[in-house]
């Protein structure tokens, strides 16, 4: 997914 927050490849997409 690509949400912008959370883990960078598990569920987030961004590192914020």
UniProtKB/Swiss-Prot annotation:
Conversion of fibrinogen to fibrin is triggered by thrombin, which cleaves fibrinopeptides A and B from alpha and beta chains, and thus exposes the N-terminal polymerization sites responsible for the formation of the soft clot. The soft clot is converted into the hard clot by factor XIIIA which catalyzes the epsilon-(gamma-glutamyl)lysine cross-linking between gamma chains (stronger) and between alpha chains (weaker) of different monomers. Disulfide bonds: none annotated. It comes from the Eukaryota. It is found in: Secreted. One of its GO terms (biological process) is blood coagulation. Its main location: secreted. One of its GO terms (cellular component) is extracellular region. Keywords: Adaptive immunity, Blood coagulation, Coiled coil, Disulfide bond, Hemostasis, Immunity, Innate immunity, Secreted. A long coiled coil structure formed by 3 polypeptide chains connects the central nodule to the C-terminal domains (distal nodules). The long C-terminal ends of the alpha chains fold back, contributing a fourth strand to the coiled coil structure. Heterohexamer; disulfide linked. Contains 2 sets of 3 non-identical chains (alpha, beta and gamma). The 2 heterotrimers are in head to head conformation with the N-termini in a small central domain. Cleaved by the protease thrombin to yield monomers which, together with fibrinogen beta (FGB) and fibrinogen gamma (FGG), polymerize to form an insoluble fibrin matrix. Fibrin has a major function in hemostasis as one of the primary components of blood clots. In addition, functions during the early stages of wound repair to stabilize the lesion and guide cell migration during re-epithelialization. Was originally thought to be essential for platelet aggregation, based on in vitro studies using anticoagulated blood. This is Fibrinogen alpha chain. It comes from Macaca fuscata fuscata. The lineage of its organism: Eukaryota, Metazoa, Chordata, Craniata, Vertebrata.
């Amino acid at each position: 997914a690509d949400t912008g927050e959370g883990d960078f490849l598990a569920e987030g997409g961004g590192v914020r």
